């Protein structure tokens, strides 16, 4: 046993605690090093702000390591946040780049002067953005938001009484409302998967829990990813492949995916997808993406697509060549009725719910009347910016920064405080910019079991922390009420009266290491800190 010359022998418990602290500090150094590699640091020792960075990129003195990070994200100059505001709630809504905002205003001014000047042009817009999401312009609709897209999906699929839909216990309100209407109006049976949290989580566990809900009556699955409560990115492709293997319709609420990660919808294999344009893609409000799989060709192809909105209905149009990836889902196309369109059945497209892979179904679904062209054009402009910057580079930036945040959290409150297992390098579940953690539960345990009274107290403390961060530190995050796994039995989730109230932080491309450190410093002033 180790000893100290003044204090005598050090207990095994203290030695273990010291080892855990050392391990946590190493995780922070590793996460920082991984992030700095994005800027080319680490090849040879450099000096930043008086701090020496070793050849492997690790800072020698963690206490002053913040000096090693760039003062701002390389993308930050494109955005116009209020001075001193640290906005970290992109999961609720994002912020459009300054140029996009300027062009948005200009478009509205032009429309005021010439009201019909921007009445059409959506086909060109869809041609522009579809490749960035790994799909055909014939399949991608610029919707009003994720909720709008989800409703147009579930109301267009001809569900019958007794059909079953598998969903999860952590859906956003849009998904909950959608399956509830199916239940109450059409007699659909809703079967719910309780999702695991913290060290109870694994992709295989998620797949097993979905499989346990499968019956002969199952018609569809509807799930969100990443989960807005926990930030966990579910195994989207594996779930869609499982659904296809069992001849089920797959519906994905991907509200947070556009703009956060590389999104290849053909590779994901979903039948339907709805995502937000105003969150991580940083478009204006009331914008989103609706995808409806309309083919099953497994090979990558070059397709010719028109530039006129009315080409599908016989109007002559110039065409452009667009590369699209092959489909991993080669199942027959499910029956689908367009529930919101001016031109149902035009040119035979989607008449009686019949599908034809050669049809431009997006043209029918897009024509719903006079939408906001400035909003649509602004959304396309943000997509152009993301494509130019590189969606892969953006995902790597976001994930690396989120991993650094998780390392700081694990260093202080322990890895048990996080919603998902903390592993480096980031596993698929962690390839997201959403981080959920709970510094309020007993032992800072995300899966701690709470009485209704303790749950209520935690909710008050969590809400107070969010409020104080905003009022005293100009930092915006949010909290949630989460049905977490139980520590005593991870196969069971907390009852509604005993939900926990963790904090949720969004790290995006305009944030930096300094921003994360600023958040951590503020958190230490307003939430519990371990007594080492």
Describe the residue ranges of each PLM region.
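N-terminal secretory signal peptides
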Residues: 1-31
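C-terminal segment of N-terminal export signals and the immediately downstream linker at the start
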Residues: 22-25, 50-92, 103-111, 306-310, ...
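Conserved N-terminal alpha-helix of the aminotransferase class I/II PLP-enzyme fold
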Residues: 110-148, 398, 403
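Conserved PLP-anchoring active-site segment centered on the Schiff-base-forming lysine
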Residues: 138-139, 154-180, 189
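Active-site phosphate-binding strand-loop segment of PLP-dependent enzymes
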Residues: 201-255, 259, 280
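Active-site C-terminal subdomain of aminotransferase-like
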Residues: 282-284, 292-397
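Conserved PLP-binding catalytic core of the aspartate aminotransferase-like
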Residues: 391, 399-406, 410-473, 480-482, ...
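PLP-dependent enzyme catalytic core of the Aspartate aminotransferase-like
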Residues: 450-451, 472, 481-532
């Amino acid at each position: 046993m180790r000893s100290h010359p003044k204090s005598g022998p050090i207990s095994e418990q203290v030695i273990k605690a010291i080892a855990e602290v050392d391990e946590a500090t190493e995780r922070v150094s590793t996460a920082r090093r991984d992030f700095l590699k994005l800027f080319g640091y680490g090849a040879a020792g450099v000096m930043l702000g008086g701090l020496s960075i070793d050849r492997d990129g690790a800072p020698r003195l963690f206490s002053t390591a913040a000096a090693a990070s760039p003062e701002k994200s390389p993308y930050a100059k494109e955005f116009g946040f209020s001075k001193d505001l640290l906005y970290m709630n992109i999961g609720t809504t994002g912020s459009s780049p300054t140029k996009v905002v300027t062009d948005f205003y200009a478009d509205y001014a032009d429309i005021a002067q010439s009201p019909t000047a921007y009445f059409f042009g959506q086909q060109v817009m869809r041609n522009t953005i579809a490749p960035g999401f790994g799909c055909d312009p014939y399949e991608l609709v610029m919707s009003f938001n994720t909720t709008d897209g989800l409703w147009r999906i579930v109301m267009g699929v001809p569900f019958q009484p007794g059909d079953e839909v598998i969903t999860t216990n952590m859906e956003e309100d849009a998904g909950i409302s959608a399956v509830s209407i199916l239940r109450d109006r059409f007699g659909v049976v809703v079967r719910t998967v309780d999702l695991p949290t913290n060290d109870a989580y694994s992709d295989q566990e998620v797949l097993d829990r979905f499989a346990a809900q499968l019956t002969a009556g199952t018609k569809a699955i509807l799930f969100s990813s990443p989960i807005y409560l926990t930030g966990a990115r579910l195994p989207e492709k594996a779930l869609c492949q499982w659904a296809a293997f069992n001849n089920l319709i797959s519906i994905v609420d991907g509200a947070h995916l556009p703009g956060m990660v590389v999104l290849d919808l053909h590779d994901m294999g979903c039948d339907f997808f709805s995502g937000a344009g105003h969150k991580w893609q940083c478009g204006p409000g009331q914008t989103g993406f609706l995808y409806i799989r309309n083919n099953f060709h497994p090979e990558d192809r070059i397709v010719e697509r028109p530039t006129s909105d009315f080409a599908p209905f016989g109007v002559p149009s110039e065409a452009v060549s667009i590369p699209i990836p092959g489909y991993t889902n080669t199942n027959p196309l499910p029956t689908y009725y367009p529930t919101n369109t001016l031109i149902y059945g035009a040119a035979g497209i989607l008449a009686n719910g019949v599908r034809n892979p050669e049809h431009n179904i997006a043209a029918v679904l897009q024509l719903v009347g006079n939408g906001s062209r400035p909003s649509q054009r602004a959304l396309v402009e943000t997509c152009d910016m993301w494509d130019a910057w590189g969606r892969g580079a953006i995902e790597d930036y976001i994930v690396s920064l989120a991993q650094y945040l998780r390392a700081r959290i694990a260093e202080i409150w322990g890895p048990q405080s996080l919603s998902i297992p903390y592993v480096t390098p980031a596993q698929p579940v962690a390839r997201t910019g959403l981080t959920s953690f709970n510094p309020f539960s007993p032992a800072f345990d995300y899966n701690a079991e709470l009485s209704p009274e303790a749950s209520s107290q935690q909710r008050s403390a969590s809400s107070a922390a969010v409020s104080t961060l905003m009022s005293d530190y100009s930092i915006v995050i949010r909290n949630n009420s989460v049905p977490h796994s139980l520590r005593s039995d991870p196969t069971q989730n907390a009852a509604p009266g005993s939900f926990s109230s963790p904090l949720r932080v969004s790290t995006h491309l305009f944030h930096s290491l300094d921003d994360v450190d600023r958040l951590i410093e503020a958190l230490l002033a307003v939430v519990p800190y371990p007594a080492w």
